Amino acid sequence: MQTIKCVVVGDGAVGKTCLLISYTTNKFPSEYVPTVFDNYAVTVMIGGEPYTLGLFDTAGQEDYDRLRPLSYPQTDVFLVCFSVVSPSSFENVKEKWVPEITHHCQKTPFLLVGTQIDLRDENSTLEKLAKNKQKPITLEQGEKLAKELKAVKYVECSALTQKGLKNVFDEAILAALEPPEPTKKRKCRFL
């Protein structure tokens, strides 16, 4: 059975673990526990063929900046996550996450993933953002940044409601199986 390795990166508390747990178990975790490193595997059928989708969760906190890249070798696709209600996590996509993955894995495709879309219209969230003269990140802003950073695509979801959740992983599988440059194998390799 062919394996697709998908590594999830992004700031702490943007919902990376919830995204993975909700997708693999159909349950939403009730409490926040920072991740050091975790992985999950699911079997998916693509064109009648079974594939193992290996999902690697990583810690977003700075304390793990030296440890995190150890999970990058042999990656087929990255999910670079930010919360649509955390403008700082959106900024860090450009400032930290894409530079980090492209430094280690220059040719590996990545998707830009906006998480927590269920909070985009929630009053208490909007009030908190407004106090700092901020607004949630829009679909258009996500698409614009994805294009600018040469992501395969921008997708967004809610791990809580599961809206858009399956699509995130369907698109990740497509990106891994049909990389934009068919002339080169695009797995991450450390030299």
Curated annotation (Swiss-Prot):
**Keywords associated with the record:** Cell junction, Cell membrane, Developmental protein, GTP-binding, Lipoprotein, Membrane, Methylation, Nucleotide-binding, Prenylation
Q: List the ranges annotated as motif Effector region.
A: 32-40
| A molecular function (GO) term | GTP binding
In this entry the propeptide is located at 189-191
Q: Which SUPFAM superfamilies match?
A: P-loop containing nucleoside triphosphate hydrolases (SSF52540)
Lipid tethering residues (S-geranylgeranyl cysteine)? C188
List residues modified as Cysteine methyl ester.
C188
Q: Which GO terms describe its cellular component?
A: adherens junction; cytoplasm; plasma membrane
* Binding residue positions for GTP: 10-17, 57-61, 115-118
Subcellular location per the Swiss-Prot or TrEMBL entry? Cell junction, Adherens junction; Cell membrane
Please describe the organ and tissue distribution of this protein's expression: Highly expressed in the adult unfed gut, expression drops after feeding.
Listed Pfam families = Ras (PF00071)
Which residues span the membrane?
none
Record-linked SMART domains:
RAB (SM00175), RAS (SM00173), RHO (SM00174)
Q: Which InterPro entries match?
A: Cdc42, P-loop_NTPase, Small_GTP-bd, Small_GTPase, Small_GTPase_Rho
Q: Name one GO biological process term.
A: establishment of cell polarity
Instruction: Describe its membrane topology.
Output: Lipid-anchor
Chain's role: Regulates mbt kinase activity and is also required to recruit mbt to adherens junctions. Together with mbt, regulates photoreceptor cell morphogenesis.
Q: Which family, according to the similarity comment?
A: Belongs to the small GTPase superfamily. Rho family. CDC42 subfamily.
Protein's recorded name: Cdc42 homolog
Coding gene?
Cdc42
